[in-house]
């Protein structure tokens, strides 16, 4: 039977994350069972044949990123990953932050003045100098805050000037509701304020922070000097999603096909139904829009569940007048 995932909210300097399948020191998600909650590792340990995933091995990490709508304080870390694979599906754009309906995601770098840099290495070093100049004033402001002191107008103006000079090197990718954003390894990226997404990622804590316009809480240093040498400067274009299945009121698209997990988007309209099997691994299922009827229950947007290994059933809308959009993820091992 499907097991609903009970989310955990994790505060962040830029907003919050809502975890559905995370198990680590910062939070342990649970299965909603019989009116109560059972932590994911507990139930994994007692279900035979790894039906809910291998005990002591993390599930594919499913979460919602919910940044604040205000510029700067709602922008995520500008960071890159060397092992962790990520994909975002945009579900909301704050209308005050982005009146035109298109939000932003910083992805890779661009040259503010191409003629000034004879080669790629010169460009990397110019970017590093811009970040280090901003980091110096950032640490000065953080030190004042730690003493309960407020910065003066000149310090605030210097922070703004150096932050904008640093950000001139980054490429801002426009995103809208429904867009899929695949984050390639070693590409610096930063989801911007007011852009709400569903994220699937490799369940490892690994990153290099290039910059952040607030005080970093999790480490006492930035990794810019090291990251600049290995980073990819440009993010490849986002490819069109392959359509795996299409029929009357039915569309199944492949969102990503990573070495460690796959994600598909399923859209059902009217009375369309889809027969589906979890196969040899568990599957994660998240409702993006509409209402799903499954296992005698109805699930609404931003509710998620784990389907045990070997599960088979029918996906259908609980409200035929409204399209049903789902995200389905399965591990590769």
Residue ranges and their predicted role:
Residues 79-81, 86-89, 172-173, 180-181, ...:
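His/acidic/aromatic-lined binding-pocket segments of jelly-roll/cupin-type domains
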Residues 1-147, 213-238, 263, 333:
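Transition-metal
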Residues 148-207:
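Loop-centered beta-sheet repeat module
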Residues 206-279:
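C-terminal amphipathic alpha-helical segment
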Residues 170-182, 293-314:
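Short acidic-glycine-tyrosine-enriched beta hairpin
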Residues 73-81, 273-279, 296-297, 316-318:
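Short histidine-centered beta-strand/loop micro-motifs
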